[in-house]
Amino acid sequence: MFVPRQLNVRKIKAFTGKENNSIADGNNNKLKDEHYKHNEASKEPSHSISGGLMLNQQDRQLIEPLNPDFLSAVDSILEIYFHRERQKEKVHLAFLIQQDDFWKGIRPNPTQNNLKYALSYVTNALFHFDNSSHMVIRNENIVLPLDIPLYDRIIYVEPVPATLSNKSLLLAGKLRKYLKEFLPYVDAIGTPEGYAFVILYKKVDQSALSKLPVPPGWVLLTRKEWTNREEKYFENQLHLVKASSSDVSNSSNSFPENRYPKLTKVEKQMTKSVSKTSQTDKDEDNLDFTKNLLTRIKNLHPLTNKSTIHSLLSYVFSRQTQNIACEPMYIDYRKDETEAIIRWKTPLHAETCINAFRTQERKQNSHDDIRAHRKKGSSRPFLIAELITGEEEKNYWRMLKK
């Protein structure tokens, strides 16, 4: 159907039979009927108008109720705003709309109309909305002294999907109906690592959190419980490191021959050239270790992991030489760090690793990048491999022996 661009079909009144003086011929009568159909269609609760014209966001709000997540997010955003800005007595809707960090991931996008609509449904003891001035005003009779330690009011959250962790206020809105007995919110802190922190006004314990009917897959932990689990994790990691160290020192006696292939002729010849610097060293603490097995890889992506580092090393080795296989005995890496310590099977492997990164000049551009190609415009620094020697090397092995 053809509709002239000059006509705004939303503003045209329905035709009644009394307006015949504006319709002069049969063509105009036909246009009148089409306009009437459009006007009738606009009354239906649909996202589109018959004929292909789409309703804009403002018109849609007059037809459909807002998403409950949007209402909860608006309520949570204002609670957190008034806690962050203790000196502010009121805030205009236009100011809230301009704060992009508030609305990350929240749909629909905020407008004055849908915020007014949302605030007409929100009831909160902390603030109220003045429709005439478009101001959200802090209630004068509400005083929130935070006399409970932060340690008892903070919650560690692992959401599903994990990408919600970087959209803290949307996450707070989704949790609102489950945490209502501990509200209001004081703050919400997001991270890109798959977890976030929510700070509440009231004290919360793990037994209460465990009983909440949160969505499947979500993890809610108190600060105390999260700290305990983190300590257990590090203890387990240290145990694995020590076990791996023991395996390295006893590999010649305890490992089956087929676990690690024998050195090729090329490897044996190259090993002879570095054998003088790879002899067993003993210090005053009776520390026994093989020198020149440790290399440090620097400038890794902070969100990478051991599996990705192993794949990256294998790829770099394959580009450096076909005669030496990539055989790291252990990758010592902690989450969020940009460095890793690699323990190799022989000093030859460590030397090959250092030479490979020196000549290939690679950059790890993302957490799962196993090729580390130099992309145009990338601001990431080059990956660097260096040999760990001297007192640092002794301290590393000494720590594993404890």
Swiss-Prot record:
Main location: nucleus
Domain xRRM: 288-402
Gene knockout outcome: Critically short telomeres caused by reduced ter1 RNA stability and telomerase holoenzyme complex assembly defects.
Region (RRM-like region): 148-230
Recorded family membership: Belongs to the LARP7 family.
UniProt-annotated location(s): Chromosome, Telomere; Nucleus; Cytoplasm
Function: RNA-binding protein required for assembly of the holoenzyme telomerase ribonucleoprotein (RNP) complex. Specifically binds telomerase RNA ter1 and promotes assembly of ter1 with catalytic subunit trt1. Telomerase is a ribonucleoprotein enzyme essential that copies new telomeric repeats onto chromosome ends and functions to maintain cell division.
Gene Ontology process terms (BP): nuclear RNA surveillance; snRNA processing; telomerase catalytic core complex assembly; telomerase RNA stabilization; telomere maintenance via telomerase
Organism for this UniProt entry: Schizosaccharomyces pombe (strain 972 / ATCC 24843) (Fission yeast)
Subunit record text: Component of the telomerase holoenzyme complex composed minimally of trt1 and the telomerase RNA template component. Interacts with skp1.
Protein name per its UniProtKB record: La-related protein 7 homolog
Region (xRRM-like region): 288-400
InterPro entries: La_xRRM (IPR014886), Lar7_xRRM (IPR045537), Nucleotide-bd_a/b_plait_sf (IPR012677)
GO MF annotations in UniProt: chromatin binding; telomerase RNA binding
Lineage: Eukaryota, Fungi, Dikarya, Ascomycota, Taphrinomycotina
Keywords: Chromosome, Cytoplasm, Nucleus, RNA-binding, Telomere
